[in-house]
Amino acid sequence: MKPSIILYKTLPDDLLHRLEAHFTVTQVPNLHPETVARHAQAFASAQGLLGASETVNRALLEKMPALRAASTISVGYDNVEVDALTARKIVLMHTPAVLTETVADTVMALMLATARRVVDVAERVKAGEWTESIGPAWFGVDVHHKTLGIVGMGRIGMALAQRAHFGFTMPVLYHARRRHQEAEDRFNARYCDLDTLLQEADFVCVILPLTTETRHLFGTTQFARMKSSAIFINAGRGPVVDENALIAALQNGEIYAAGLDVFEHEPLSVDSPLLNMSNVVAVPHIGSATHETRYNMMACAVDNLIDALQGKIEKNCVNPQAAG
């Protein structure tokens, strides 16, 4: 008899068939309490859980006594109570490697769009404001040869450093929990403390997960330390930044512009002052959102769950100690 799993994400047919070859699959639209209650027997017997974005907490786990593995279609897992899973000996799998290059492309796009004011001037053209040769009011700033500061030198930080160093001849500074020798050797990246990075970088790019240590890491003090010409990019997690402090820094001219893929509360409220600022490029958490990469993430998550329920957790496991 096949193990049973709960699937709370729509998958392409080929990936669904791959799951069905190994498991009895119950598909649900979400993990809301009413959904769990409606499918109580399926949740109670499920050994696996696969999906994205929904909250996985102790209350849900109480309804899933047979659960052995959860697989998220994401690299981040701040919506999952990992400690609760680990206490129950439930492994959590994620998809870190397959989205690296795509997210780095997104960060680079935000850097270029903010520096060259691509969104702002495109909207002005559409509004019929281009009636003569453009002047300084339409100008942006250069990207090449400017200093890039990366906060969080993981896989995505490395991919961004590669683009900046080789493609745009940018000196690279970085701040991370530990030195990254490969970044220093390949890209001549310079490790520094956060204050030094903020004071010297022309672009400050944040690529951090959300933890208790990183929540509101960027606030009034940090923005005040940045150059008034600096461009701030956040492609990690929204709550790493105190959004009110960022808004104030932009309104007061403490920094030049911001490119934001993530926000403290998502979706971003239509009333947010950020949406009324011409020097802000705001996109809806599109970091990995290409057809190719999202498919690869789903395929990776499917394979992760198959492996985990066969006792194979050598890669992509957040909490391998749970299997001990």
Swiss-Prot record:
Main enzyme class: oxidoreductase
InterPro entries, per the entry: D-isomer_2-hydroxyacid_DH (IPR050223), D-isomer_2_OHA_DH_cat_dom (IPR006139), D-isomer_DH_CS (IPR029753), D-isomer_DH_NAD-bd (IPR006140), Glyo/OHPyrv_Rdtase_B (IPR023756), NAD(P)-bd_dom_sf (IPR036291)
Entry EC number(s): 1.1.1.79, 1.1.1.81
Residues at the active site: R237, E266, H285 (proton donor)
Reactions the enzyme catalyzes: glycolate + NADP(+) = glyoxylate + NADPH + H(+); (R)-glycerate + NAD(+) = 3-hydroxypyruvate + NADH + H(+); (R)-glycerate + NADP(+) = 3-hydroxypyruvate + NADPH + H(+)
Location in the cell: Cytoplasm
Matching PROSITE patterns: D_2_HYDROXYACID_DH_2, D_2_HYDROXYACID_DH_3
GO cellular component, as recorded: cytosol; plasma membrane
Pfam families listed in its UniProt record: 2-Hacid_dh, 2-Hacid_dh_C
Entry annotated with the keyword Lipid metabolism: no
GO molecular function: glyoxylate reductase (NADPH) activity; hydroxypyruvate reductase (NADH) activity; hydroxypyruvate reductase (NADPH) activity; NAD binding
Top-level lineage group: Bacteria
Similarity comment: Belongs to the D-isomer specific 2-hydroxyacid dehydrogenase family. GhrB subfamily.
Classification via PANTHER family: 2-HYDROXYACID DEHYDROGENASE-RELATED (PTHR10996), GLYOXYLATE_HYDROXYPYRUVATE REDUCTASE B (PTHR10996:SF283)
Function noted in UniProt: Catalyzes the NADPH-dependent reduction of glyoxylate and hydroxypyruvate into glycolate and glycerate, respectively.
Subunit field text: Homodimer.
Protein name in UniProt: Glyoxylate/hydroxypyruvate reductase B
Native source organism of the sequence: Salmonella paratyphi A (strain AKU_12601)
Lineage: Bacteria, Pseudomonadati, Pseudomonadota, Gammaproteobacteria, Enterobacterales
